[in-house]
């Protein structure tokens, strides 16, 4: 039987409980889960790629089948490189779907062997985004309900609480 591999891409700037929810649930469904940290050209990052990887690795250390990577290039090329045929994308609300559909259509056009699966974020986390968490943290407010302790500490350091 072949190994099932999936990729969860994202900027993870920083990782939140919403991301971790999708990662945990995906790790139960695939033999190997690869988190691919991508630089979003439309956003300036708060954390470096290396910092994001470290924060993610700490957040998923309880999962033996999860590996964290950085990749410059097309996501479908990363999938080819590691032999993954599934991309997993989390959806918080219907408003996420239009953007995700465009990405899925482009990825399918670039590589017809790669399928995208959507997973709804648990309702507890459906309002959380990295951008909102950073904005709240920048105002020195408590973000412990949205991110793990080590991420909260990193945010506090970035925004010098």
From Swiss-Prot:
User: What catalytic reaction does the record list?
Assistant: (R)-4'-phosphopantetheine + ATP + H(+) = 3'-dephospho-CoA + diphosphate
- Entry keywords, A to Z: ATP-binding, Coenzyme A biosynthesis, Cytoplasm, Magnesium, Nucleotide-binding, Nucleotidyltransferase, Transferase
Output the SUPFAM superfamilies linked to this UniProt entry.
Nucleotidylyl transferase
Q: Which CDD domains match?
A: PPAT
- InterPro entries in the record: Cyt_trans-like, PPAT, Rossmann-like_a/b/a_fold
**According to its record, what are the GO cellular component terms?**
cytoplasm
For binding substrate, which residues are annotated in this chain's numbering?
Answer: 11, 43, 75, 89
Protein task: Reversibly transfers an adenylyl group from ATP to 4'-phosphopantetheine, yielding dephospho-CoA (dPCoA) and pyrophosphate.
State the protein's name.
Phosphopantetheine adenylyltransferase
Gene assigned in the entry: coaD
């Amino acid at each position: 039987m072949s190994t099932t591999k999936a990729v969860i891409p994202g900027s993870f700037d920083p990782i939140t409980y919403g991301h971790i929810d999708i990662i945990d649930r995906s790790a139960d469904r695939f033999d190997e889960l690869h988190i691919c940290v991508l630089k979003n050209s439309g956003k300036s990052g708060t954390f470096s790629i290396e910092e994001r990887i470290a924060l993610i690795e700490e957040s998923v250390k309880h999962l033996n089948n999860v590996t964290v990577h950085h990749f410059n290039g097309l996501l479908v090329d990363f999938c080819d490189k590691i032999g993954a045929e599934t991309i997993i994308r989390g959806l918080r609300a219907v408003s996420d779907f239009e953007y995700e559909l465009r990405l899925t259509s482009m990825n399918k056009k670039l590589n017809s062997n790669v399928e995208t699966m959507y997973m709804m974020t648990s309702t507890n986390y459906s309002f959380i985004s990295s951008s909102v968490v950073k904005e709240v943290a920048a105002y020195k407010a408590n973000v412990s309900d949205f991110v793990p302790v080590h991420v909260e500490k990193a945010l506090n350091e970035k925004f010098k609480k």
